[in-house]
Design a protein with these regions (language model features):
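Conserved active-site tyrosine of GNAT-family acetyltransferases
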Residues: 115-120, 255-259
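Conserved G/P- and acidic residue-centered "switch" motifs that form tight phosphate/ATP-binding loops
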Residues: 85
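Intrinsically disordered, low-complexity, positively biased terminal segments
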Residues: 1-3, 11-16, 51-52, 64, ...
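Short amphipathic alpha-helix that is part of the acyltransferase structural core
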Residues: 1-33, 123-129, 135-174
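Conserved catalytic-core motifs of GNAT/GCN5-like acyltransferases
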Residues: 102-106, 121-135, 267-270
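Conserved hydrophobic beta-strand within the GNAT/NAT acetyltransferase core sheet
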Residues: 72, 103-108, 245
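A short helix-loop-beta-strand connector motif used in the catalytic cores of GNAT acetyltransferases and
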Residues: 30-32, 37-49, 55-58, 69-71, ...
């Protein structure tokens, strides 16, 4: 029997409906965020649509990180069409686009049973910190490092070191993504780096528009002082604005009460 739905590729005309699907789940993404994610997926992976009678009822994105790794995200099936095997069919299509690669994803509690049924295993939990940003009032850095080295704005000559550092510390081959993020930054978006006394890059962070306001991410740093300094530098003009940071749950980096005063030795944010 023919399936009542079909898989094909998302187009620019689908962005608004994708946004509506995510709004139904109370996800914060803007249409501009969807446009960016779909663009990356179509260039380096797959952007799949599920349609029934020409209507978009589901979507999902796959991103390739080099030849060995990939990730899947933004997987949604309209609530009216759930429990019909559509999510599994969509997910298998995304996996095909990442064949031969180790695949990672961030799952909601609702989606976790589906992913576990397909062989995925939980390796950690993510924690989200967000709120209206207030200037930090914490203690001075504990290490004798100058403020300029702790965090300064990215300079063109920093880019090769930033890309190498990201691949080494994050474990993903994603220079195209980072270069696209940096090239597409608006005038009020920021990238900051941290360097040591020998000029070696040992941390970076990006502040960009996302959802209800701003997100800090990616964020990587070799120590607490550098991670905190990067966040301070990136957010120094965002007082009162809505800011979000996502971190691994076992990274006690930015407590909800004062998300700018602590970070453990290796702080990572998507």
């Amino acid at each position: 029997m023919q399936e009542p739905f079909a898989l094909d590729t998302l187009t620019a005309a689908d962005i608004h409906t994708c946004w509506q699907l995510s709004q139904a789940l109370r996800w914060p993404h803007r249409e501009a965020d969807w446009q960016q994610f779909i663009s990356w997926a179509k260039a380096h992976g797959a952007a799949l649509a599920v349609r029934a009678d020409g209507q978009l009822i589901g979507c999902g994105l796959a991103w390739q990180w080099g030849d060995e790794q990939g990730s899947i995200g933004m997987v949604i099936v309209d609530n009216a069409w759930q429990r019909r095997g559509i999510g599994k069919r969509l997910f298998k299509g995304l996996l095909q686009a990442l064949e031969g690669r180790d695949v990672m994803l961030q799952a909601t509690a609702q989606g976790r049973p589906l992913y576990e049924s397909l062989g995925f295993a939980a390796i950690g939990h993510a924690r989200q910190f967000h709120g209206h940003w207030q200037p930090p009032t914490g203690a001075a850095p504990t290490a004798p490092i100058t403020t300029d080295n702790l965090a300064r704005l990215l300079q063109p000559q920093d880019l090769p070191a930033l890309l190498a550092y990201d691949q080494r510390e994050r474990g993903l081959t994603r220079p195209a993504l980072l270069q696209a993020l940096l090239a597409q930054m608006d005038a009020d978006e920021r990238c900051a780096v941290s360097v040591d006394e020998q000029g070696r890059l040992c941390g970076y962070g990006i502040l960009r528009r996302f959802g209800r306001g701003w997100v800090v991410g990616p964020l990587l740093a070799d120590g607490a002082d550098r991670a905190v300094a990067l966040v301070k530098r990136l957010t120094q003009e965002r007082t009162g604005d809505f800011v979000r940071i996502d971190l691994a749950a076992d990274t006690r980096a930015f407590p909800a009460s004062h998300p700018h005063t602590q970070a453990q030795a290796q702080a990572q944010a998507q």
